Amino acid sequence: MSETTTLEICGKTIHPGESTHFNLTSYRLPISDMLDTPVYVFRSLKPGPIVLLQGGMHGNETNGVEIVRQLVSRHGIKNPLKGTIIAIPILNIAGFIAGTRDLPDGRDLNRCFPGSKNGSLGSRIAYSLTREILSIIDLGIDFHTGGEKINNYPQLRCSFEDAKALELAKVFHPPFILNSPYREKSFRREAAKNTKPILVYEAGESLRFTKLAVEQGVHGTLRLLNHLGVCSIQVPKVDHTIILSSTSWIRARKAGLFRTTKKYGSFIEKDEIIGTISDPYGEKEYDLKAPADGFLIAINNKPVVNEGDALIHVGLEK
């Protein structure tokens, strides 16, 4: 929607030109304290798109939290030229406090959508986000990082079947754009059902700030907001974006100590040796070879690996 009048979110009325914050959800901890999920809304007097910036879907993915924090601290974000910016720095507050990916009951919040008013904790949070936020936005960016010990090179994920999402991803101008099918019960899937494009930004490693991941996330978001006319903030130019139609994981054939000889983000050639697995006693060593020409878009930084562990993520252009 491209609003011209008031917005109603969580029972709060927000007029054009207003900025405010409130809680999307509030729930009680076992120690009786309340845990709130803050939402920040910045509105222009001029009508325009409503854009969601969301971090902390998974509590240990701190790069996304830092990206949203840096964005909302900018004057140009707090005072948009047109439209509305809705920012949720941390969606999974309980997981963030505990430093864990999931909710206290072990559920993945990103598999709880569209949610239920009287369901599990994750289902209730998903229900509030779907009903109060997803229903009014035009598009959004959901900031993530790699899973435990997985370091993702900055990349945007969207379904190439969604022409609008792909167009927006190109405007964001990340190093890589990946064709990513929808996953049932995910936030992005629920948004697609309602024709709301959500770009998933993946960069860095859980529980670790990565300068490149944060910078690329901030700059890409500003490029997109500039393109939409929501802001006018100077952003560094980039050379090009590589579009990847598919990806493949290189997995450990043997257990042992894993080392890689390549930097993430680099191009690799088929059959090139890109890593080794050794036993801890210096007796045996196995080479890891690239399955095809492609780009190294993620590395597992875990030094001790088991058979079948995902080690290196390779992006393929065709």
Where do the PLM segments sit?
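Structured catalytic-domain cores with a bias toward divalent-metal coordination
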Residues: 1-318
